[in-house]
Amino acid sequence: AYHPCCEQEAVDRDVMLHFLRENTDAFTRENLVAHFTASSWIVNSSRTHALMAWHNLYRAWSWTGGHADGETDLLSVALREAREETGLVHVAPVFPEIFSLETLWVEGHEKRGKYVPCHLHLNVTYLLEADAGDALRAKPDENSGVRWFMLDEAVEASTEEWMRARVYEKLNRKVRALG
């Protein structure tokens, strides 16, 4: 069982567990209110840098991740998305357990010519380690750049204030606590 690191994670865990009990479609985008997603905080082997992608939709440097789309193995989703969005070949979990939890608000937007209403992402984050020597490439339909940042620079690079303060800083604190 996941042990929350703070009040935010404890509340979000309770929301997620309640949502799972009440919704059979929690892992699909067919649930327009909320659905599960998986993200990765990708670090190099010395854990001094994090890999970020310039997200086209949010117009911000961001972690990697995506929708579960029916898959309940969220670690597999996080790994798949990390590889797809960055071109990484050598990437693996630091450990298989959940690293962080977040309930994230997504504004209404257009995707592939279709309106997507405001909804929540019930997000599970995994800590991944990658070979900083791997060639990186963007995934043009989702991002337009991928690069390594020093941990604190990764936070500063994001223009999403809420993500900086509530997610990326928390992830860096947790990485540093690992030693």
Model-derived features with residue positions:
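Unchanged
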Residues: 69-162
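Short low-complexity stretches enriched in small and charged residues
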Residues: 7, 40, 79-83, 169-170
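Charged phosphate-binding loop/patch that engages nucleotide di/tri-phosphates or the phosphate backbone
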Residues: 159-179
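Acidic, metal-coordinating catalytic segment for phosphate/diphosphate chemistry
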Residues: 3-39
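Glycine-rich, flexible loop/turn motifs
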Residues: 23, 32, 57-59, 64, ...
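Phosphate-binding glycine-rich loops and adjacent basic patches that engage nucleotide phosphates
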Residues: 2-3, 37-48, 117, 128-136
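N-terminal strand-loop-strand
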Residues: 28-63
